[in-house]
Amino acid sequence: MTQTQSNHLILDFSHVYCDENIPRNDKLHWIHCSDIHECDLYCSDAAATEIHRRIDPYGTRGIHFLDSGNYHYVTKIMTDRIDEPFSLILFDHHTDMQSPMIEGMISCGDWARSVLLDNPQLQQLILIGPKKADIQAIYNDKEFTAKQKKRLKEKLIAFSAEELRADEGHEKVERIRMDVPFYISIDKDVLDERYCETNWNQGRMSLSLLEHLLRAFLETGNILVIDICGECQQGIPLPEYMEAEEKNAKTNRKLFEFLTHYIRRKSTIPRQKAPRHDEKA
């Protein structure tokens, strides 16, 4: 695989980033995806193969913008390319762990379930932001086999929106492994509507809390990729659309600047080899 110079990507499925007036520069490489069929909400094998082909030259590092939450399944395509043990940190108002609706297709609603159950390199999935009831629904899902339930119990660590607001769940932090690199995936629907407007119902997290939680991983962990999705709904009245786009563009810029600050800073610090999970630090 040949890796190009810029690892920061914009995957343009709906041209939403064009409407946000994101400047084109050498920091962000645009990958045009609007001509790919069978990829909105649900993604066929053919579409997944084509998406993989287009992102393959850019490696598995950097910050990637994935368009709206309809395309959040791209995170699965990205993580399928990782050839070393890793953990997925998922910020999302939804669990994205529904039972598959259409055989042979991944979707924005079930991709995380597929990563958890099927990716042999996944060590942990740290899910941050859904409602407590939605997290409990994962454990109550009767479609899991006994083997899948065991894997779920071993690998899933979930922090509900209620726990975050009450500053609870600290005991679960101790379970997070720090000896493997992190893939961080952010769906902006975890944020309150003051900060962005997405095409899905949203949580109530502040941008400052999201940055605080991200900082805990960015300062101490080895980060492979950070992806961001969650853009506004298409087809709404133009004044509402432009207002939403302005709000989303502002948050996208803030997140990009915040994340690149940590990436630049850590790139100047010699990386120390992390202890194995069975070793004492």
Describe each region flagged by the PLM.
Residues T2-L66, N70-S87, D110, P120, ...:
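Catalytic cores of soluble, metal-dependent hydrolases
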Residues L88-P100, W111:
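Long, hydrophobic, well-ordered secondary-structure blocks that form the structural core
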Residues M105-I106:
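Glycine- and acidic-residue-enriched helix-capping/strand-helix junction motifs
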